[in-house]
Amino acid sequence: MEATAILRGARISPQKARLVAAQVRGLSAESAVNILRFSSKKAACLIKKVVESAIANAENNHGSNIDALKINTIIVDEGRMLKRFMARAKGRSSRIVKRSSHITVVVGPAK
């Protein structure tokens, strides 16, 4: 059985989070957590929590063996954008877009 975990509204841009997600896509759950644990990127900490939550969901809800789990899919979608203004020279202003992400992780048995 597949188990899912979703983090909505993570305050990181999807472009930055997708770089980390691509590193662990398709790996076993244990090796993915180890890679994310030693990564220095902010997205790695967020994705590690979601992967660990999906592993816990698989164990508690479906009784899956943790050692046999693999990351089937990991998707990073765009979330809500916060629009802010920054003061510039000569009375002007420019727009700042603070992006957020929705991170979805699906783990299942390795085939």
From Swiss-Prot:
Q: Does the keyword Lipoprotein apply?
A: no
Protein keywords = Ribonucleoprotein, Ribosomal protein, RNA-binding, rRNA-binding
Where is the chain membrane-spanning? none
Is Metal-binding one of the keywords UniProt gives this record? no
Q: Which GO terms describe its cellular component?
A: cytosolic large ribosomal subunit
GO MF terms, alphabetically ordered? rRNA binding; structural constituent of ribosome
GO biological process terms held by the UniProt record:
translation
State the superkingdom. Bacteria
Q: What family does this belong to?
A: Belongs to the universal ribosomal protein uL22 family.
Subunit arrangement?
Part of the 50S ribosomal subunit.
Protein role: This protein binds specifically to 23S rRNA; its binding is stimulated by other ribosomal proteins, e.g. L4, L17, and L20. It is important during the early stages of 50S assembly. It makes multiple contacts with different domains of the 23S rRNA in the assembled 50S subunit and ribosome.
UniProt name for this protein? Large ribosomal subunit protein uL22
Annotated source species: Xylella fastidiosa (strain 9a5c)
Q: Which gene encodes it?
A: rplV
